[in-house]
């Protein structure tokens, strides 16, 4: 979909959805679309249309809802001038050839499954005002290599970046308080991550991140729960430091995890722990407490932090 306005203030449409435009936006049925008619459009539904580019639609000045679900030939989108549009649920669902998109600067959230299965998308600039990234927002964006999450984001939904198999690095801003289940699951190229201090729960977060070597926590971490196999099958992870605030731990199938530095003075409750051949380092004043706690099965592996 692409069009231009000429001096007569009429829209000229091009591409494979010309008839759709005239059928839906030409209110007076004169075979033309005026700027007034275009400004009255709040929703455009192009689901499953065979379009390749979506540019020049800034003239729909009051456009709020755009649906491009399953537009499998779509490659390029420019929404920079559509200041009222929302990046809604499933907006570009399985647009597998989408490789370039420009988003409007004033959006506040990325909807659920908005870019699900956009496997050709290599990069995306998320506007600074965004505060929430929804469930499965970028699930299966297998060409996405790096992404900067804006500083105002506070919530990253379940499976938000799951199966982003080329993702090597990601910046999680300090304001984030919640990271959903499997948010980074099966990100097999991800090598390092830093968890902001306001996050209190990590649940099944990094399963199958086979290249993850470094996990760090911001100073003053308020993390309480590391559960549901948070690092399941993280084969490259050999060492980890557990913040002093942690109260409960589930960890399994970290087959190469050799050193665990556990800083809580009160031993965290151990629900499920299927790791072998590791050394657990704990505060010296808490050595006996750990050996007589739910960690007692690993009595001989517990040593003091030097």
Residue ranges and their predicted role:
Residues 26-35:
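Acidic, glycine-anchored loop motifs typical of Ca2+
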Residues 2-7, 21, 279-306:
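Extracellular/surface-exposed low-complexity segments
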Residues 89-93, 111-116, 134-139, 157-162, ...:
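Consensus positions within tandem repeat domains that build extended binding/scaffold surfaces
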């Amino acid at each position: 979909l692409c069009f231009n306005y000429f001096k007569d203030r009429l829209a000229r449409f091009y591409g494979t959805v010309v008839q759709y435009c005239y059928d839906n936006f030409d209110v007076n049925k004169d075979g033309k679309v005026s700027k007034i008619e275009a400004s009255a459009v709040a929703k455009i539904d192009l689901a499953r249309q065979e379009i390749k580019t979506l540019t020049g639609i800034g003239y729909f000045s009051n456009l709020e809802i755009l649906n491009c679900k399953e537009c499998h030939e779509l490659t390029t989108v420019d929404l920079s001038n559509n200041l009222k549009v929302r990046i809604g649920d499933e907006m570009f669902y399985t647009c597998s050839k989408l490789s370039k998109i420009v988003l409007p600067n004033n959006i506040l959230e990325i909807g659920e499954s908005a870019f699900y299965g956009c496997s050709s998308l290599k990069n995306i600039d998320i506007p600074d005002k965004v505060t929430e990234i929804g469930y499965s927002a970028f699930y299966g964006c297998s060409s996405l290599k790096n992404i900067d999450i804006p500083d105002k984001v506070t919530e990253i939904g379940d499976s938000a970046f799951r199966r982003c198999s080329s993702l090597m690095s990601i910046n999680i801003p300090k304001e984030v308080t919640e990271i959903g289940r499997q948010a980074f699951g099966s990100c097999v190229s991800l090598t390092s991550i830093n968890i902001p201090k306001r996050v209190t729960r990590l649940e099944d977060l990094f399963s199958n991140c086979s290249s993850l070597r470094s996990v760090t926590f911001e100073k003053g971490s308020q993390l309480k729960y590391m559960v549901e196999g948070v690092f399941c099958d993280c084969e490259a992870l050999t060492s980890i430091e557990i913040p002093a605030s942690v109260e409960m731990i589930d960890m399994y199938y970290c087959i190469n995890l050799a050193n665990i530095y556990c800083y809580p003075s009160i031993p965290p409750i151990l629900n499920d722990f299927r790791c072998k051949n590791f050394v657990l380092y704990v505060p010296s004043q808490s050595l006996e407490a750990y050996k007589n706690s739910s960690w007692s099965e690993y009595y001989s592996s517990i040593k003091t932090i030097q």
